[in-house]
Regions:
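Aromatic "clamp/platform" in nucleotide-sugar-dependent glycosyltransferases that forms part
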Residues: 85
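Short hydrophobic beta-strand element within catalytic cores of glycosyltransferases
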Residues: 102-105
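Nucleotide-activated donor-binding/catalytic signature segment of Leloir-type glycosyltransferases, i.e.
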Residues: 47-65
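A short, well-ordered alpha-helix in the C-terminal region of glycosyltransferases
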Residues: 145-160, 166-172
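Short alpha-helical donor nucleotide-sugar binding micro-motif in glycosyltransferases
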Residues: 72-77
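Conserved acidic donor-binding segment of nucleotide-sugar-dependent glycosyltransferases
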Residues: 117, 121-129, 138-143
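Short acidic/histidine- and often glycine-rich active-site loop of Leloir-type glycosyltransferases
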Residues: 94, 107-123
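Conserved donor-binding/catalytic core segment of Leloir-type glycosyltransferases
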Residues: 2-18, 24-28
Length: 185
């Protein structure tokens, strides 16, 4: 929260492939009362988008190098939105999930897989603005939903994306390989 306002957050590069403008267009169309959108990050489109989409309910944080501050921002946010058109597996998404944010991301790269099955809301990369225009009021009006999505996101990241879960998976893989007979040369 920012004061008495609920916080929606984008954290990442402000570049074409991140599709931040789709989020800003949807935000402008919906104007979610009682909420702020915080854009954390910098990039080639930062100045242009800030000039075009400047408003009292959009806060332009800029690049944040300090880890403790980034964590505090994530913990203050209720909803994390990642509207990317191109992505691998977003570290920012995993960090938001670990912080207990309700997460909304496109199906670009592995992000859709990470959120599938109830750990978040997955959007198509086609028509992101339209989808967000429908979804933002629901997230604004349903704090019980956002809390549950945040809980499930955190549970998912702790199950699958911690260092220990990756070590365990690697050990299982090695054990499976070692059980098989060596091939003759």
């Amino acid at each position: 929260r920012i004061g008495d306002k609920r916080m929606f957050l984008y954290m990442g590069r402000v570049a074409t492939e991140k599709n931040v403008e789709a989020l800003l267009r949807a935000w402008r169309l919906v104007k979610p009362e009682g909420c702020h959108l915080v854009i954390v990050g910098d990039g080639p489109l930062h100045a242009t988008l800030q000039n075009t989409y400047s408003s009292n309910d959009v806060l332009w944080w800029g690049y944040e190098a300090d880890l403790a501050t980034r964590v505090a921002l994530l913990q203050s946010a209720e909803v994390f939105v990642l509207p990317s058109l191109v992505e691998g597996l977003s570290l920012a998404l995993l960090e938001a999930m670990a912080s207990g944010c309700a997460c909304v991301a496109t199906d670009a790269g592995a992000d859709g897989e990470v959120l599938a099955g109830g750990a978040g809301i997955v959007l198509s990369t086609q028509g992101v603005t339209t989808q967000l225009r429908t979804l933002l009021p629901v997230l604004r009006d349903q704090p019980v939903l956002t809390r549950e999505l945040g809980r499930q996101a955190r549970e998912r990241v702790l199950e699958r994306y911690t260092m220990q879960s990756n070590i365990d998976a690697l050990e299982r893989l090695y054990a499976d390989v070692m059980r098989h007979e060596p091939m003759a040369a």
